[in-house]
Amino acid sequence: MLIEDIKKQILLENYIITFHAHRRMDERSISTDDLVNLILNGSIIEDYPSSKPCPSALITGIVGWRDCHAVVALCENHLRVITVYWPEDEKWTDNMRRRRN
């Protein structure tokens, strides 16, 4: 999956934020603008091409002053935001870009 394809859907405003993602964003005080900026300025750190119903990816970026992750699925006719979260230091390394073993 290419980040450019994901960004294109964001720029076209052709995305859906799932109920779960909305809840997580509310819990973390992450706005839709924050999410859009995270995706437009972020990068893919994990790719899940065999995800169902659509291929998905984990994107890392910055919201405010914090590292933030978003899982998105690139479906045939839209982008779906699955979840958004603050990565935990003990689970990630390399500036929150690689999972610890």
Regions found by a protein language model. Give the residues of each.
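Ribonuclease/tRNase effector modules and their secretory precursors
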Residues: 1-101
